[in-house]
Amino acid sequence: MNRIQRVSSWLKEAGHTAAFIHTKENVFYLTGFYTEPHERLMGLFIFQEEEPFFVCPGMEAGQARNAGWNHEIIGYADHENPWELIEKALKKRNISIHMLAVEKDSISLSRAEQLKHATGGAQFVSAEETLNQFRLIKDDNEIRLLKEAAKLADYGVEVGTAALREGISEVEVLAQIEYELKKKGIQGMSFSTMVLFGEKSGQPHGNPGTATLKKGDFVLFDLGVILDGYCSDITRTFAYKTINPKQEAIYETVLQAEKAAIEASKPGVRIGDLDLTARGIIEKAGYGDYFPHRLGHGLGISVHEYPSMSQANDTLLQEGMVYTIEPGIYVPEIGGVRIEDDVHVTKDGAVALTQYPKDLIIL
């Protein structure tokens, strides 16, 4: 059963007439076509029995076909109203939609209103939970792509460390990393690259700028790539030239927490218990107040996807899941340490896809 058939089967079981899928990530998952439509409408209609159809800007219809979509494509010009074309397509097929599964968390109010009109007042139900479950367990090809993306993330850290010299700015190092990764053929970075020096490393989502590197700084890299539609995400922290005892204690605590959470990752383990494992180590060391975020997040087509690796999550790990483990400690006036790996759950336990060394390195 292919992915479209799987959605059709779910619609039939749930009693929903159809699904309208519009996010670029889920469109890619179901069609193999990856694009950024910006403000233009892109959407996929899937039914219980009828043939699906795909609506997209006409200038991208050929790319969708080349990506492997072998069902109908309704391409539209910029002067045309795609909602009118959708309404005509449904009427032509004599399809009356009563219950329509949509990505309710991401569709705008304006588009929801236009979709409701085009479908003759269909009642909306959520498609997110089901699509998240479909994407949760990665197949062999997805694991292969995630491994390749992880290797390139490792390479990005390698480039970053090689670029370091006293007085260089965060943005100069960032530019070198992204330039070298682009030369490797990536689609793009999976999120805004972070290169943070000194006290700025203590900002969990800091913005690189003109801060320059000096002796005794922590250097934090957080980066990832998109390769053939799949993402990676790695964080490594280094000391530059020297390290004081407090910095070293922080680093070793984070490293111990990260390793323990990876070791605990096995099928059947509650996700929340991974967070609690890492958090317990950090709290015991006296830094509990300085670990302000969850342990990690799901990883795949999106750099942040289901599941959330928080202590409140009762979901049990399954073979084929991929997610990040990224504990951190962030202390004002000292800086921060975060260590992050992409983790694949196998029947025997967890395998880290990112492989860059993570024992303390003084550069």
UniProtKB/Swiss-Prot annotation:
Mn(2+) 1 binds at D233, H297, E326, E340. PROSITE patterns: PROLINE_PEPTIDASE (PS00491). It is an enzyme of class 3 (hydrolase). The keyword Nuclease does not apply. One of its GO terms (biological process) is proteolysis. Pfam families: Creatinase_N, Peptidase_M24. CDD domains: APP-like. Binds 2 manganese ions per subunit. Mn(2+) 2 binds at D222, D233, E340. GO terms for molecular function: dipeptidase activity; metal ion binding; metalloaminopeptidase activity. Its EC number is 3.4.13.-. It comes from the Bacteria. Its cofactor is Mn(2+). Keywords: Dipeptidase, Hydrolase, Manganese, Metal-binding, Metalloprotease, Protease. The keyword Lipid biosynthesis does not apply. Belongs to the peptidase M24B family. This is Putative dipeptidase YkvY. The lineage of its organism: Bacteria, Bacillati, Bacillota, Bacilli, Bacillales. The gene is ykvY.
